[in-house]
Swiss-Prot record:
Protein name: 2-C-methyl-D-erythritol 4-phosphate cytidylyltransferase
NCBIfam families: ispD
Gene: ispD
Class of the enzyme per the UniProt entry, highest EC level: transferase
Assigned keywords, A-Z: Isoprene biosynthesis, Nucleotidyltransferase, Transferase
Catalytic activity of the protein: 2-C-methyl-D-erythritol 4-phosphate + CTP + H(+) = 4-CDP-2-C-methyl-D-erythritol + diphosphate
GO terms assigned for molecular function: 2-C-methyl-D-erythritol 4-phosphate cytidylyltransferase activity
The keyword Transferase is assigned to this record: yes
Length: 272
């Protein structure tokens, strides 16, 4: 469906305000180098490769000195906004920073900044299936390993059935107004949702699971980075630096716009 009538109709949010403390080192993991480019370059290029993508909003940390200042990827606009202390806060900021042309019931993608190995076929399938559902869908992978439940003493308390268990991946696809309501309500309740589907679940909604490739992994450890570098070499992947345009959109200006929207947005009953 890459040549579908959806061309240029979907915006993506990339939360990139995290520090990646599990990885260690001075750089946030999304800026680690692989093949001569930051990891996030591959992430943005993978999204921009789909003709349905209209543009990307990247939520960055207020003190981010590493953001390369991209304003477009493959001629598709890249906007920035200031993210929050949690993933959910950054995603909400990104949703509120979307252009006015994005309507309340339009679908929006959310994708991890440090998940650079997204396949075009997976994104295509997610859009095809997710847009046919009133709620949306997420990429996910069936759990294949045997799962053990641990006791407080480190011993095994039991084995969990895996037949209906899936690992949540990204991108995740939901309507703009449902994202706003779900993330806002979770925050108000003091619940730190770890992905957007969890916010939907809290509202009683049931997103679809779309099976994605196992190699759509998130880079969280040095071993993950080495694995991605191996994939780059094996497949001969390179980023065309000319496809990444700068100077940067002013993040402080976007942040003021987000603050204004946070103060004035009305949620109503349109998110169910």
């Amino acid at each position: 469906m890459t040549g579908s009538i959806w061309a240029g109709s979907i915006w993506a949010i990339v939360p990139a305000a995290g520090r990646g403390t599990r990885f260690g080192g001075p750089l946030p993991k999304q800026y680690l180098q692989a093949g001569g480019q930051p990891l996030m370059a591959y992430t943005l290029m993978a999204l921009a490769a789909h003709p349905a993508l209209a543009g990307i909003v990247v939520a960055i940390a207020p003190d981010d000195a590493d953001w390369p200042g991209w304003t477009a990827v493959q001629s598709k606009p890249v906007l920035t906004c200031l993210g929050g202390a949690t993933r959910a806060a950054s995603v909400l900021a990104g949703v509120l920073a979307l252009p006015e042309s994005v309507r309340a019931d339009d679908f929006v993608l959310v994708h991890d900044a440090a998940r650079p190995n997204l396949a075009l076929a997976d994104l295509d399938r997610l859009l095809e299936i997710g847009r046919g559902d009133p709620v949306g869908a997420i990429l996910a992978a069936p759990v294949r390993d045997t799962l053990k439940r641990a006791g407080d003493d480190g011993g095994i308390d039991g084995t969990e059935p895996r037949e209906r268990l899936w690992r949540a991946l990204t991108p995740q696809l939901f309507r703009r107004h449902q994202l706003i309501r779900g993330l806002t309500e979770a925050s108000a309740a003091g619940v730190d949702v770890t992905d957007e589907a969890m916010a939907m679940e809290r509202m009683g909604l049931r997103p679809l699971l779309v099976e994605g490739a196992e190699d759509n992994f998130k880079v969280t450890t040095p071993a993950d980075l080495a694995r991605f570098e191996f994939e780059l070499a094996r497949r001969g992947i390179a980023v065309d630096a000319d496809a990444l345009e700068a100077p940067a959109v002013n993040a402080q200006s976007n942040a003021r716009n987000v603050a204004t929207q946070l103060a004035t947005v009305s949620y109503g009953n349109d998110a169910t």
